[in-house]
Amino acid sequence: RTLIIILFLWADTKLFSSEHSVNYSFTQLSIEQGLSQATVQSILLDHKGTLWIGTQNGLNSYTQEGIKTYLHHSDDPHSLPSNYINHLTEDSLGNLWIATPKGLALYDAEQDRFNTTISQAIYSSIKVKGGIWFGSENTIYCYDYHSKKTKIIHIKKQEKKKNINMVDYRIQKMVYLDKNKILVGTRRKGIYSYNCQTQQFSLFIPSSPNLLTSLYITLDQHIYTSFYGSGLYCYDQTGKIQEHYTQTNSGLNNNYILDITEHNGKLWLSTDGSGINQFAPHTQQFSQLQHIVGDYSSLPVNSITLLYKDQEKNLWAGSVRGGIFCIKETYIKTYKDAVLNNPNGLSEKSIISLYEEKNGKVWIGTDGGGINLYDPSTDKFTHFPSTYGDKVISIAEISESELMVSLYTKGIFLFNKKTQQYRPFTIIDKETNYKECFYGYLPLANQVANNKIYIISRNAYAYNTHNHTFSKMQTDRHYDFSNNALCLSYSN
């Protein structure tokens, strides 16, 4: 009987990632792409699709046309009040507000300029019915859309005999507890509840010795807070503490949490130096996304200042020195080259050949980096320095201990997995081997059965790995080679 076999020189490869594992891709914008500064304080995607990025040195707008930077100019009253951007928000009317330590600016899109409306430092905001509120130091500025006027609310009233440290009452966060109550988080004086009907403040969560860094209410109405260096707190709707997660009593890898958001059923926690923690409340389990040196698919940086989910449900992260990046789920993970013997990448990023063992491990032939071994169970690579410099154009398994590899311009060798050394392999005899390996052809080894390897070069042979015999195969010369394929006719 006649068996027709097509051997493609380039074939589809199986993904290394396991079927159910989720990886993440990161699209980064930083100084190299035109950002004015790499420390990001605030991110906003407006209703027109423009991405606004507030840094410690300027405001940036990002569109399909590129990045445009806005700065403070002392001789221009319509420039930004300050280059240090604390906060960005868009109100219900589509107006863009920019909060800085030296005032609040409203962006005039038609004139492409700014009008400063409040000269005091602004740190936070919240949309309310008929307007928008801005948090300052012990003060909330309440802007009304209809009247275009602003009224002021104070958390604590100044007493004649007692001075208030206004900085301690800096309003870091404002979120809705319910339709009539707003939680107002201060820098050092705790979290207050503001009743919109009675217009009264009451202390909701007592103060902490450390600075408030984040305040977030989940869809199931749990309240989460973070104080710098104190881990993660969870409260119920009455302000009663439910849980306190730290490095010592949970899987949290860093107590310095800078921001909190909810995404795809998990809490995402940005940390100061340890990447992003993902927390699953239903299992009480933490997992991490971190930057790993040499792993180009890992988180770009480990110090994350903020997390922002836009109206398209894209998740963005701002960082201390790496600009911003968009985080998206993907079932494809990209592996690039790393320094020799770094297990997080390849010895050479150009891959010529692949062979998967029964145990799932993948042998990789590179273009000049020799042989690599990938273990999916650990997601790590092993480099073999003894093969470094070799261009490995095909790999097949000749036994449990040896691989048959074809090396560009060198011929076919057997590679011992334990000793990590080559030994020569001869196709039939020295004369035949020379013609097949050094007459301008590249011998390719392809395993088609447990005991059978096809060796394709000037001619084609079936090699039996058990009795070490060769059978010459007939080539179908009428086959169309336009698809880079070799067609063989072989009779058993």
Give residue ranges: language-model regions.
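Carboxylate-rich, polar loop motifs that coordinate divalent cations or form catalytic acidic clusters
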Residues: R1-N492
